[in-house]
Design a protein with these regions (language model features):
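Short, Lys/Arg-enriched N-terminal segment that forms or immediately precedes the first helix
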Residues: 14-28
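Pre-recognition alpha-helix immediately N-terminal to the DNA-recognition helix
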Residues: 36-41
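Basic amphipathic alpha-helical segments that dock to polyanions
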Residues: 70-80
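A short acidic, leucine-rich amphipathic alpha-helix
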Residues: 53-59, 70
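Short capping segments at the starts of secondary-structure elements
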Residues: 31-33, 44-50
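Non-DNA-binding regulatory cores of transcription-related proteins
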Residues: 79-151
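Short, intrinsically disordered or compositionally biased N-terminal tails of bacterial proteins
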Residues: 1-13
Length: 151
């Protein structure tokens, strides 16, 4: 999972849409068509997606699903510890599976974002914990600079 998350949401070992739907049921939630389609979109392309992008993917299969429904479902999935959001620059928050916790390098010039290897931050996380009692939330940890192409 990488360096410590420092978030209160539980982390669940979910590897499929059906695993998440079982978790939703266990938590007393409803399994709706829009929730299933959203999960399929996330699992089909487990990268970073804005809520708007996910809405487009879901609406391609169910045009009546509104953006507000996507946001409500993402909020519930985040509460369950299935997805997390990250802020990669000045754009909207992006969502990805919680099991893929990682830090980001974000280019301030072109806006590109790449996954940063957790190993780069282990000593920082250890030191922050040891010296300050602070646990780094890797889902929200981005380092801004200039990418190779923009230098």
């Amino acid at each position: 999972m990488g360096i410590p998350l420092g978030v209160d949401a539980p982390q669940h070992d979910v590897s499929s849409v059906d695993d998440v739907l079982a978790l939703v049921r266990e938590s007393g939630g409803r399994v709706t068509n829009s929730r299933r389609l959203l999960l399929e979109a996330i699992f089909d392309d487990p990268g970073h997606h804005s809520a708007e992008n996910l809405a487009v993917l879901v609406q391609a299969r169910a045009p009546d699903v509104h953006l507000s429904t996507i946001y409500r479902n993402l909020e519930e999935l985040e509460r369950l510890g299935v997805v997390v959001h990250s802020h990669l620059g000045h754009g909207p928050a992006t969502y990805h599976l919680a099991a893929s916790a990682h830090c980001h390098f974000v280019c301030e010039h072109c806006g590109s974002a790449v996954k940063a290897p957790d190993e780069l931050f282990v000593s920082l996380a250890d030191r922050a914990k040891k010296e300050f009692g602070f646990t780094i939330d890797t889902h929200h940890f981005s380092i801004f600079g200039r990418c190779r192409n923009c230098q």
